[in-house]
Amino acid sequence: MPDSKTARVRIVRMPGGADDDSVVVEEPLEIRVGDKPVSVTLRTPGDDFDLAAGFLFTESIVARRDDIESIRHWSSPNVVRVALAGGARVDLQRLQRHFYSTSSCGVCGKASIDALRVNAEPLDDDVRVDTGLLLSLPDALRAKQTAFETTGAIHGAAAFTRDGALLRVREDVGRHNAVDKVIGSLLLERASADILVVSGRTSFEIVQKCVVARIPILAAVGAPSSLAIELAHEFRLTLLGFVRDGRCNVYAGEQRLAP
């Protein structure tokens, strides 16, 4: 199957003249639970089943892998239908958000901090990671970002074990979508991770997704927002920013870092 993440377009370089260039593809994806649409997000095609599973899990629509019976495309490549397992208990009305979200806004009125407090516990404090190892992980992510190398316009997320073993890498025009793809893949394969690395900044929704997925360490190449830091402290998540060039800032959870 050809790569659906990028497309070729005609441009004019100044100076230089007409040329062809690669750009990242951005298309809508409708996620349905049964016959009920629950979200439309702008994403980069690819790993759509992972995205749907990760979205439903991190928004607490489903609580576990066994809640999902099947995922398949429905009527078009831009519609995904999730069938729930018999006995799965979900509350679609609990999701207080706008129906549409854009590639730059994952939270956009979705689950609030109060809802997260009801559905999640603070993270366990049983993971220790070598700081030097953590500082090397953004380079490991970047080395696997094939679409970024081509376009320079796509976010990446990667899951690792505490020993630095790479588990998953996903790319998407939306940072929150890349994270959902990683978490959804882990969920569908009943796997777990200790560290999530993201290529850009860290906002509230990225911390929220880590808390729900029980990933205790979040490292980002960019900076976190004030709300991301507040949430990290409340749920005892280790939050690192500006992880590059052999250094970083630790905003919360420094107890998990070994010298």
Q: Can you describe what each PLM-predicted range is?
A:
Residues 1-157, 161-162, 166-168, 173:
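Intrinsically disordered, low-complexity regions enriched in acidic/Ser/Thr/Pro/Gln residues
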Residues 175-259:
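Feature captures the catalytic cores and cofactor-binding loops of soluble hydro-lyases/lyases
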